[in-house]
Amino acid sequence: MTSVQICIAAAALTAVASFPPVARGQAGSRMNEVTTAEAKAGWVSLFDGKTLNGWNVIGGVRWTVVDGALSAEPASQPIAPTGDSKQTWPQGFLRSAANFSNFEMTAEFWSAEDTNSGLFIRCAQPANPGSLGGCYEINISDPHATTPTGGIVGVHSPLPYRVKSAGKWSRFDVLADGPHLVVKVNGETLTDVRDEKLKDGAIGMQAGGPTGSGPIKFRNIKIRPLKRN
């Protein structure tokens, strides 16, 4: 291992080690809030647990807050195909009002086996968070053939897949530090890559898509902006 590789590995370990502990929804766990220690370390909450404040709704999916979580209900039926088009499902997004460049981020999510969702970072096209050329999409789809949960669509596929996230509350830990991108799911690193394409943009969350529509919920969405030397 070269000295440069050692420095990169050490920086990644330091960043991941600074993620806040898991809030398990028990009494006194302060769901959707940053603790005093987290605030001193620079963490802020992107979701207040009560409203959609700080988020813009895009597309044809209804988002609500249920039991302290951002919730998108699955569509009851797909969109009927027209002409040569294929059958698709209604798709919608939440997009953060603020942009972020370099950061650590955590988010808990609940998905089903048929859920088609994703967590988007550095969305350079604010009107279209689903644009694969304008966002890094951290996929949420355990059975996806090429990019299961924790992979970045078009960048990295975590195969063979070794983490089951569906049917329970799971957690993303994300590092975006310059070109260095790290994604953990429930504490296990599934993506650790370098990619130069996108440097800044909004955070996005997806519900529904071309291949299916299942329930998705998000909570405890926290971010810590990083300063690069």
Language-model regions: role of each:
Residues 3-4, 15, 36:
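N-terminal compositionally biased, intrinsically disordered segments and leader/signal-like regions
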Residues 19-229:
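Carbohydrate-interacting regions of secretory-pathway proteins
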Residues 1-9:
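Bacterial N-terminal signal peptides that target proteins for export
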Residues 11-21:
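Hydrophobic h-region of N-terminal signal peptides that target proteins for export
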